[in-house]
């Protein structure tokens, strides 16, 4: 059933049941990461990062116990609220080579994100209780940030 809209099993679906027309709105953003789920987000309102990040969403993807996920993606939004292409903003939390066929368990698993009063981002980990501070270094008036 390619491109079909189905009701999830946790909401009474059976893998074939479609919702009534108009019952659900179309999602603004979808994430198609294998074995990874968006678990938290923050819309950036600070001024410590370049203006291109203002109003966009930083989304935490929580990976499974294999090589997928474990990162923070950025989704820009235009003035009309339309999302742009999402891109990985911060990665490396898993602390293993993602190209490995059997990488083993991840060292860290991002679970939450917040914007601090200083405009930095704070990412929390569910594996070891660590919190990372991500701050922009350079002139925030420049158009793009480097990782």
Which residues does each predicted region cover?
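Beta-propeller domain segments
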Residues: 1-100, 104-108, 134-147
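Conserved hydrophobic/aromatic packing and binding residues within compact polymer-binding modules
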Residues: 131
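Hydrophobic beta-strand segments that make up the repeating blades of beta-propeller
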Residues: 57-59, 120-123
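Metallocofactor- and cofactor-centric catalytic cores in central/energy metabolism, strongly enriched
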Residues: 115
């Amino acid at each position: 059933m390619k491109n079909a809209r189905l009701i999830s099993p946790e909401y009474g679906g059976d893998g074939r049941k479609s919702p009534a027309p108009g019952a659900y709105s179309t999602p603004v953003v979808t994430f198609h990461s294998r074995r990874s789920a968006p678990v938290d987000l923050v819309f950036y309102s600070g001024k410590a990062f370049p203006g291109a990040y203002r109003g966009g969403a930083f989304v935490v993807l929580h990976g499974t116990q294999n090589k997928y996920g474990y990162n923070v993606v950025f989704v820009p939004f235009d003035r009309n609220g339309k999302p742009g292409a999402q891109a990985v903003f911060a990665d490396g939390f898993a602390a293993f080579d993602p190209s490995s066929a059997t990488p083993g368990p991840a060292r860290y698993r991002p679970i939450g994100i917040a914007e601090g009063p200083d405009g930095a981002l704070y990412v929390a980990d569910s594996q070891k209780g660590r919190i990372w501070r991500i701050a922009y270094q350079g002139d925030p008036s420049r158009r793009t940030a480097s990782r």
